[in-house]
Amino acid sequence: DTIKSVVAVMTESSVGSGFIVSSDGYVITNYHVLQKGGPIRILTYDKNVIPATLIGIDNLRDLAVLKVRGDYDYLNLADSDKLQVGRKVIAIGNPLGLSFTVTEGIISGLDREGPNGIQEYIQTDVSLNPGNSGGPLIDTQGQVIGINNFKIGGAESLGFALESNSIRDSVNAIVGKN
């Protein structure tokens, strides 16, 4: 059932991934998926295309909060302070337009520094490709431990996800303003 809370996020010029974090339709994705602008739509697991409204962004952490109408199954954010290197994880996303693709791997490192200079990233060997951005990195209990954000080009198995505690703080700040 975890996969039912993952969505494809689409604009006129880009496609990425996202996930639902509340029953009333809040969706999290990476801001860079939306950055070129245009109307935002999401594709649900049951093949519905729904317009989405941008609620707010955290540019530093490359996060965006969207809102869609309806009632949804959603994913919970885990406590990323409890993560351990070597734990099994899965990524669900939309790599190269292949909707709802599932890949697996492990947590390779914690507290890695991202291109933004903050040490809030999980290193993983999960296969991440263009279109995976904004999708969840999930533990074996089906909870989100991170949002897939970037990979190191020219290297294999060097993917990075913003940790769930940072997501929670950012989303609470964004939603609290609206």
Regions found by a protein language model. Give the residues of each.
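Short pre-catalytic strand/loop immediately N-terminal to key active-site residues, enriched for Gly-Thr
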Residues: D73-N76, I122-N129
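Gly/Ser-enriched beta-turn/beta-hairpin loop segments
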Residues: T2, I55-D62, L110-I122, G153-G154, ...
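Conserved active-site neighborhood of the chymotrypsin/trypsin-like protease fold
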Residues: S13-S17, S22-F100, G117-I118, R168, ...
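C-terminal cap/linker of serine protease catalytic domains
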Residues: A52, V144-N178
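Short, acidic/hydrophobic/Gly-rich beta-strand patch recurrent on exposed beta strands
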Residues: A8-M10, R41-L43, A64-R69, G105, ...
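Short beta->alpha transition motifs characteristic of CBS
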Residues: N30-Q35, S108-G109, P130, G146-G153, ...
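A short, Trp-centered hydrophobic/proline-enriched beta-strand micro-motif
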Residues: D1-E12, S17
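Catalytic nucleophile loop of clan PA
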Residues: F19, L128-N148
